[in-house]
Amino acid sequence: MDFTPTQEQAAAQELAARIFGDLATHERLSAAGTGSDPELWKALCGAGLVGAVQEVGLLGLVLLLEEQGRTTAQVPFAATCVYGLLAVSAHGSAEQRERLLPGITDGSVVVGGGFPAQGGVRASARGEPPAGHQQGVQAPHQQGVRAPRQQGVRDPHQQDVRPSTHAELTGTVPVVPWLRDATHVLVADADRNLWLVRAGDAEWQPVELTAPWAAGRLVLDGAEAEQLGGSDAYADVLATARTAFAGLQAGVCAGSLARAVAHTNTREQFGRPLATKQAVQLRAADAYMDTEAIRVTAYEAAWRRDTGLACTSHALTAAWWASEAGRRVVHTGQHLHGGAGADLDHPVHRHFLWGRQLDAYLGCGDELLQELGELIKEGEEVDAWDR
């Protein structure tokens, strides 16, 4: 295991830190409200950072997302790189790569994802409509994405229908982060096939989340979609998403802790800085250890994927740390600010909101542990990169 950044990864991280630091200021973030920052997105794409992910790999992306998390910059960087750039690069056909990748790298194509993790937002197939419902009609209180069976092609040697490369999807994805900015959305059906839908071919309504992620509710009613990859694509993209968003959480926690350290070093009580108090030191130390645990597990999962090793369980581990420990860290960051931490306009409150949102997005810690336990019980990882 060697997490030492390559020269290219270090250069990309340094450039990202400079751009995020210059443009994702407290004043600009406050002015943006719950929307994204188009000027910052243009700067990132113009600097070649989105396209650079193809060269620096998932570990490089984790490093870049750490810098985004430190500043809580409101751009669809993680979603576009995970559900767009890396997914299309790894699983798209030659025609899909040629058609989609140029737009993704220059920022004109923004991709959202409808299935981040177990226990979070996920699209699943419903199968055939229940009795009394017409084809393509969503039953009340049932959500998910269904790829109609007749859209497939029948294999004469098999009883089942294998999906064609195009289908019409019906269903609802309750929350898709950055949907308001997206030109495409990647969703999964119950058979874990991935489908790429043009946002303009679907209906959506804005949804406000804990963090300002420009989210929306995606409604698919016979929307045309193209399949991305084969049966192994779902597991890889899911593991990639868990790893990447864990890296984003590591940055959010690092930013929250850095603000808490600065505050407690300058704020005095009874003539002494708050940082000299033992209770403050212990809480800050615990938060630091939690942040490092998130970081190192995300690094390991990313490194394993980049080197072609099994990473499913490692991505789950990173997601668990990001969910459970991340929540502890952002609470600590707010608590160490005392009364100032309760101010909704204080910069540290933004880290608190992002940390809680990532906690929810990655999924409940108990469910992640259950999934990890089932994987360990099976005794092996089903991972396309080992084949």
Functional labels for PLM-detected ranges:
Residues 68, 73, 84:
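Anion-binding (especially nucleotide phosphate/pyrophosphate-binding) glycine-rich loop
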Residues 102-258, 385-387:
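FAD-binding core of flavoproteins
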Residues 18, 22, 43, 90, ...:
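Amphipathic alpha-helical regulatory segments at dimerization interfaces
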Residues 55, 75-76:
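Signature of the chorismate-utilizing enzyme
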Residues 75, 94-101, 110-112:
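Short secondary-structure capping/junction motifs at helix and strand boundaries
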Residues 76-94:
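N-terminal glycine-rich flavin-associated loop
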Residues 58-62, 81, 97:
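Amphipathic alpha-helical segments in well-structured domains
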Residues 1-69, 107, 133-148, 152-157, ...:
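Alpha-helical interface subdomain recognition
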